[in-house]
Amino acid sequence: MSGRIKTAGRALASQCGGAAAATMDPYDAIEAFDDSLLGSPLAAGPLYDGPSPARFALPPPRPAPLAALLERMQAELGFPDGPALLRAMERWNEDLFSCLPTNADLYADAALLSADADAVVGAMYLAVPGDAERLDLNAHANQPLPAPPASEEGLPEYVAGVQAHFLAELRAREERYAGLFLGYCRALLQHLRATAARGRGAAGAGAQADRLRQLVAARYYREASRLARLAFAHMYVATAREVSWRLHSQQSQAQGVFVSLYYAWPQRRQFTCLFHPVLFNHGVVALEDGFLDAAELRRLNYRRRELGLPLVRAGLVEVEVGPLVEEPPFSGSLPRALGFLNYQVRAKMGAPAEAGGGWRRSGSTRTRGRAARSTTGRLQRPCCGPRRRAKCCRATPRQRLRARGEPRHTSGSGAFSQGRRPGRVCRLGWACKARSGPARGGPGPSPVRSGLGLSRARGSPGPGPACGGPSRARGGRRRASPANPFGGTYDALLGDRLNQLLDF
């Protein structure tokens, strides 16, 4: 194996140029990385030199049917392709949303989202945030976006700062989008009241009230969820797009600083998430219990291109000749992207009921004072009980950072077995929670803690647990995993993987 690795190292070194190619090993080739080999990534999309300017929402809408409200929302958001995007997500299997925080606390006191039909009707004429102030849909937080570090020693702090910036921006946007959404809910409810007054047998006030409760139970929650899907799909995509292109314009000028990192994504949903804090993963990349291959990267980039996001580049994974994108296959038996968006909607719309001490049993009955949501009952029920949610722990993609001039790995028989000590390992505190316990066959906890966990106020809900979204079915035998970042199993696999990647 060592002979193959040496030859592979020389082959990679020959691409990096110079008379020293004959003596370069893979580490030397990494240190001599030339980002010009990847072409010019700046031509791929728009550039953002700074935060976007303010964009104010219109005043809350007047009572109107659902179709008119959806059309108005599309125009207000500048999102004419929103319905087409939602339809397309019905045929996507990628989990784009479940790693993003639900921010359900923003909706806990919203009477318009109550599970009690009487409470909803009572909130029909209450004020919404858009009544008192103009809502800036491009609102920004006070957390600045850091500049890329000059050397890899500053990468842990940089990645933590990027993540904190994105989550703060998303929170600031959602505070405004929540007010926008509640204004549309009120308009929808007032329209249903007018419909109840025009219905048959609604001559008396009591009959009209009963008819309105029936309409709330039969239509309000379902139609409000359609408004929520459109609004929050735009919020997630627009926020991820803006921050990602700003990162792209920064990181594309400093790609060499990211070469020494080892990236590990314990869960696939972390890899398919809308937001990536590092767009140039030129080190070795591990996905779930194996290593990322070129096909997986092309499929991820296909979806990112459809969403207007910058591509994720990986110098060791990409093939020399060929396209950067490839359409992913679709399986009707697997969860769909729209289902993961529905999980976010469910968490937000169900926040008042959960804050009130539990969920009412929902069915097809139409009882007085209770919202029988029929099919949308599933949309608002929590995915699991409090005990199961409490067991969910934070899973973080890990990165291995070898500083220049640092001794290398010693154990194992693979590429890192020639008198080297382990490099520094940093944990990447991300917005995703994992299932309880370590991932089966995945890497264990990092022996070095760098304190990159995202801090939040005590009592504020964190990101949605893994059980909140549909789970991807897995069949067949699992691949061998890099079980220990410092053990022989990992070295052997990594050495074999490097031979595959560098075997010309």
Swiss-Prot record:
Location within or outside the cell: Virion tegument; Host nucleus
Keywords, alphabetical: DNA-binding, Host nucleus, Host-virus interaction, Phosphoprotein, Transcription, Transcription regulation, Virion, Virion tegument
Pfam families tied to this protein: Alpha_TIF
GO cellular component: host cell nucleus; viral tegument
MF terms (GO), sorted A to Z: DNA binding
Comp. bias intervals (Low complexity): 361-378, 447-460
Gene3D superfamilies: Alpha trans-inducing (Alpha-TIF)
Top-rank taxon: Viruses
Family according to the record: Belongs to the herpesviridae tegument protein VP16 protein family.
Function comment: Transcriptional activator of immediate-early (IE) gene products (alpha genes). Acts as a key activator of lytic infection by initiating the lytic program through the assembly of the transcriptional regulatory VP16-induced complex composed of VP16 and two cellular factors, HCFC1 and POU2F1. VP16-induced complex represents a regulatory switch: when it is on, it promotes IE-gene expression and thus lytic infection, and when it is off, it limits IE-gene transcription favoring latent infection. May play a role in the aggregation of tegument proteins around nucleocapsids during virus morphogenesis.
Name of the molecule in the record: Tegument protein VP16 homolog
Protein's organism: Bovine herpesvirus 1.1 (strain P8-2) (BoHV-1)
